[in-house]
Amino acid sequence: MYDKQEVELDGLINRVKFFCEDRDWDQYHNPKDLAIGLSTESNELLDIFRFKSEAQMQEMMKEEKCREHISEELADVFFFVLRFAQMYEIDLEKALTDKLEKNNKKYPAEKVRGRNLKYTEYEG
């Protein structure tokens, strides 16, 4: 599935940074436009699955051409995440670690295992 080779996040962020700088795109990458880009690309990923049944989606995930399309859309989403973090000095590793800690408290495994409820639905 994956090559177990570790990918350094900083290296990917730098590749995105240089890609954009080579094209003089910093001027277009304010927080609003980066958020719009992220949302747009996320919706392009979502559109692949629109009006599909569970069975159809499972079949799609077996098709190489469809998997390639999905991979490209995921890469577009990841690009905007990395670019936003790079432009506005957000430490993604710390942000994710902190968020996982918060979610671990909101969604303790012993309470939510096998359930997909929002934390407000099982508190109390």
Give a label for each model feature.
Residues M1-L74, F78-G124:
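Flexible "arm" and connector segments at domain edges
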